[in-house]
Amino acid sequence: MNPEVQEKRGFFSKIPRKLKWLIIALVFNNVAIGYLLVYLTAFFPELGINAGVVGLLLGLEGAMVLLSIPLGILSDRRGRKKLLLIGTSLVPIPIILIALTINVAVLIVAAIILGIAESAALSTWNAIIADQTSIENRDASFSLSFIIGNGSIAFGFLLPTLIPTLQSLTGLSSIIIHQDLLVLMGLVSAITPVWLFRILKGYKETPNPKKLIRGKNFPTLLKFSGINSLIGLGAGFIIPLIPTWLFLKFGTPDTFSGPLLSLSNLTIALAAVASPRISGRFGLVKAIVATQGFSTVFMLSLALVPDVRLAGGLYVIRAALMNMAGPLGDSYLMGVMSQEERGLASSINTVVWRIPNSITTVIGGLILATGRFDIPFYLATIFYAISITLFYTQFKNIRPQS
């Protein structure tokens, strides 16, 4: 196709057709995960489940991404397809378990299974995208994945708005409808691995069982991941617990926080459309720094906000700005890694981000349980500012490769 014609059609026209279908296949998993997150963080507190327990479940799920490192090595050596299929196939199990009980022991088991599923998917997904793209279409590919992913999660966040209507139509209690809807979402999530299996039938990989674990770019990976982990550490104090914070501070149920998270994710998805254009104009590093920096200002403002509607508006803006940097960061890391290093690189970056995030989520839940609703935002702001400064100073002269 003529390059000028392709440019007029937009950035996303450059993405391989099969990759687009792979991105769409994850929609069913993501919708289910979206509703599950609202169920855990907004509906559980309504049932009287302590914020500390909510933080523990989220933290345990996140901690399981430690498995991403050995799974990432395995994906580089043996191939990525099987691991992705296994990970997406596990997702329905914990969702249905959580719908059927509030027994803490069972919930812990479910959180661990969900973490294992996420580890298998995260250790392969970014590498699969990078393997099928070049420097010309990589930013657009990661952005489309980010947009579709966040849009489908947003749909899951929105589902609690249906519950009052379903109550009036069926006469069932809110608790039963919440639970039945989560079971339905678990069943819907099973569509993803079936669809992926069909799409990936002809996907060819070249296993490299003798490949060295540490490649030439390993020091760069450790530096990038270490700095990025400070974002994860700061975010953990409050971001996964936003619905819990809204309920405890303002008394808002999931019929408010669910749509707010949905609006936030839709805004994030729309904002990510601009990500490739911003990086094309200013460069990846400057684009990442600018979006994260402006987001941090809005993060700080949430510590002092007195009104729930204002809090919702500020949170949406903060989320959109911060997450515009998400696909750009993924694209940047995959661009500075060789093809043979990408599975491990994606895994290490995920683990180093999620482990601190998981720990501080538990701490954040405990802080919220004491009634100190501002401290988590102050802590998050400090770590964001340190990470953004270090990222710019360390990576401003390092360019991605094809």
Question: For each predicted feature, which ranges?
Answer:
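Cytoplasmic helix-loop-helix junction between adjacent transmembrane helices
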Residues: 112-149
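Central cavity-lining transmembrane alpha-helices of secondary-active solute carriers
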Residues: 56-73, 262-274
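Glycine-rich segments within core transmembrane alpha-helices of 12-TM secondary carriers
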Residues: 143-164, 352-360
